């Protein structure tokens, strides 16, 4: 099988119907904040134990195709010495590696950021491939305000995403491209749709200019939502309409799948919106791409609350993870109901 065929096969596997992708790629800094919110010390060993809790959950592979890992996590191991990546592979779950090196201010563009991490990326991808990673993730961030995002900022980040994607495919790794349009802000649903459409159109233009094989790419996208500070919060039905209209106007049919980030929504709201999107998709007779979930907070918040850093709570925390995964799997089929919570 050629490299192109292998990439396309892996991309399809990652968007297997009614399964999702667990985003467990919080940086040590973000994970430490989550530990502190539970009243726990921000320690490396607690971070490792938490990841072990997630990855050893019985039945995880029934609901997820892949898990996104931070660099520190793919290099870490379970209590018995098994590398986390090997533990996942043994379950039939694909290790996905986050490879960007976070954001820095975009010089001369106030209030905007760009993502860094291209330097040395080809070598890092080779190392991650050898460690078992078969997909990667790179996140760009766009803030909506009266003056942002600018065309220049969108172009810069989309060029970077395209270069990253090309390097991934060269290394035999499926690129997940994540242009996140932030939920925070006081923008309307219409403005969110306008910006998300603009960003996605520019992204796919750049991917095509860089000869990236779109059949070997996964898009990780925001849902289209009015800003968190906008006076009227969007109904699930309106989110579904705006999101699917945006995709129809910007995502080429060759792309095998689109996975959603939860992006600061509560776990229940993210699930409700996913369900509305699936219901609308069924009404419309389907779309060219598989649609799935790739939540972090939207899956893990209840897990952390159940765990509280205590070994005696591991079973309850793992049960909370399976419950959230089941609810999102049902939402992905349009069969979720809030009474199931």
What do the predicted segments below correspond to?
Residues 67, 136, 175-176, 217, ...:
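Hydrophobic residues within beta-strands of alpha/beta enzymes
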Residues 74-75, 182-184, 226, 300:
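Short, active-site-adjacent cap segments at secondary-structure transitions
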Residues 183-254:
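Catalytic core of soluble alpha/beta enzymes
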Residues 101, 142, 181, 223-225:
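Short, histidine-centered active-site or binding-site loop motifs used for metal coordination
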């Amino acid at each position: 099988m050629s490299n192109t065929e292998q990439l396309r096969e892996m991309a399809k596997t990652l968007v297997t119907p009614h399964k999702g992708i667990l985003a467990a790629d919080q940086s040590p800094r973000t994970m430490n904040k989550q530990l502190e919110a539970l009243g726990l010390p921000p320690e490396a060993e607690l971070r490792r134990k938490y990841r072990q809790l997630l990855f050893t959950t019985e039945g995880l592979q029934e609901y997820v195709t892949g898990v996104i890992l931070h660099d520190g996590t793919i290099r870490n191991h379970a209590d018995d010495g098994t590398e986390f990546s090997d533990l996942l592979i043994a379950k039939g779950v694909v290790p996905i590696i986050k490879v960007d090196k976070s954001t820095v201010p975009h010089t001369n563009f106030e209030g905007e950021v760009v993502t860094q991490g291209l330097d040395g990326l080809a070598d890092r991808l080779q190392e991650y491939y050898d460690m078992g990673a078969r997909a990667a993730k790179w996140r760009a961030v766009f803030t909506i305000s009266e003056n942002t995002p600018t065309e220049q900022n969108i172009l810069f980040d989309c060029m970077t995403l395209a270069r990253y994607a090309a390097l991934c495919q060269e290394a035999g790794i499926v690129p997940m491209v994540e242009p996140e349009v932030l939920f925070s802000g006081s923008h309307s649903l219409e403005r969110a749709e306008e910006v998300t459409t603009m960003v996605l159109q520019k992204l796919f233009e750049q991917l095509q200019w860089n000869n990236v094989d779109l059949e070997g790419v996964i898009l990780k996208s925001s849902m289209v939502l009015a800003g968190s500070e906008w006076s009227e919060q969007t109904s699930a039905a309106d989110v579904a309409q705006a999101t699917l209209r945006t995709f129809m106007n910007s995502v080429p049919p060759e792309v095998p799948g689109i996975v959603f980030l939860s992006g600061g929504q509560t776990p229940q709201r993210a699930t409700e919106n996913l369900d509305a999107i699936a219901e609308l998709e069924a009404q419309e007779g389907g779309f060219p791409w598989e649609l799935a979930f790739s939540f972090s907070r939207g899956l893990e918040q209840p897990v952390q609350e159940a765990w509280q850093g205590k070994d005696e709570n591991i079973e309850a925390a793992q049960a909370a993870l399976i419950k959230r995964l089941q609810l999102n799997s049902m939402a992905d089929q349009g069969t979720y109901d809030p009474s199931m919570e």
